[in-house]
Amino acid sequence: MEISYYEILEITQNADKETIKKAYRKMALKYHPDRNQGDKEAEDKFKLVNEAYEVLSNDEKRAIYDRYGKDALKGGGFGSSSSGFGGFEDLGDIFSSFFGEGFGSSRRRKSSNDEKIPSDFIVNLKLSFKEAVFGCKKNIDFTYKCSCKTCNGTGAKDGKLQTCPKCQGRGQVGVSQGFITFAQTCPDCQGIGEKASEKCSDCKGLGYNESKDSVELNIPEGVDTGMKLRVNAKGNILKNGTRGDMYVKIIAAEDDTFIRDDDDIYIEFPVFFTQAILGESIKVPTIRGEATLNLPKGAKDGQRFVLEKEGVKDVHSSRMGNQIVQISIKFPTSLNDEQKELLEKLSESFGIKDGMHQEQKGLFEKITNWFKS
């Protein structure tokens, strides 16, 4: 069954205009795209909320809807106006009238003095597992932007700009969704409200030129994926001549043997069943070579042991992480006659007769007595 406009706004059918307005404000805030970016369900609900309000806030449309339903509003001159809501001159005014200067028209129009380029930028640097753990030197090639001196970063010939014809100098254009129009940055002038009547021949209208450079970087020991290293004064060059920074984002490869978790290293190490039963000192690999692990008697499959300070050095201090060794007990898959005979004798020495251990026999007896009781 189709949900009614009153249910969409969570109000009763006899609600007055003020109640409808308050309900709309509440629901529009809840499902507004700016607060639910990437949420398709919220976007659909936002459209329904606007559709419901457009009808219920209009006395004529509401009367027709109450009497004949939604279908009666289709066609017949009762559709929404070309702007989504009539009577609001500036884009986003529908929201500013309800919510103040927090939505739509409150977006600051950019100034022609604003930079077309950010001062800082990020480059990705891929490292091997060992390079990230132990540090290394890397030569990084990169491209940076420099504000065009010919046009002073405007992108216009001789630096002269004219009012943007698409947004009429507002820096915003309207985009309709359902029954509402909201503002977004003008794609032609990027929100400045002005654009070049003739492009600068030097930068081709971009407002900046690109140059290539390289730098040798000392990668510290212990970096990991997602960490950023700042390289001072290697960013973009702005109109006033100041230069930003370049940030190098680390992408560290994984290893086939070792698993890294921050500064700790994990490894699964195979142990023969006799070693686990009898206990033994064994050699295990570490990121720096090998270390001795003293297995206790009766070690269990999946049991973990900590080798202190055998992990990765913390990138911000001298603290060392640990290595965690998880043992995996292995059993022989084939036996020769001598091995089979030895194991059979061992089995008998533990009291296993007729295919059953004494503990298993005791359990069966308990279950049998349970059925008899």
UniProtKB/Swiss-Prot annotation:
Its main location: cytoplasm. It holds the Pfam family DnaJ. Zn(2+) 2 binds at C164, C167, C186, C189. GO terms for cellular component: cytoplasm. Binds 2 Zn(2+) ions per monomer. PROSITE patterns: DNAJ_1, DNAJ_2, ZF_CR. CDD domains: DnaJ, DnaJ_C, DnaJ_zf. It is found in: Cytoplasm. One of its GO terms (molecular function) is zinc ion binding. HAMAP family: DnaJ. This is Chaperone protein DnaJ. It comes from Campylobacter jejuni subsp. jejuni serotype O:2 (strain ATCC 700819 / NCTC 11168).
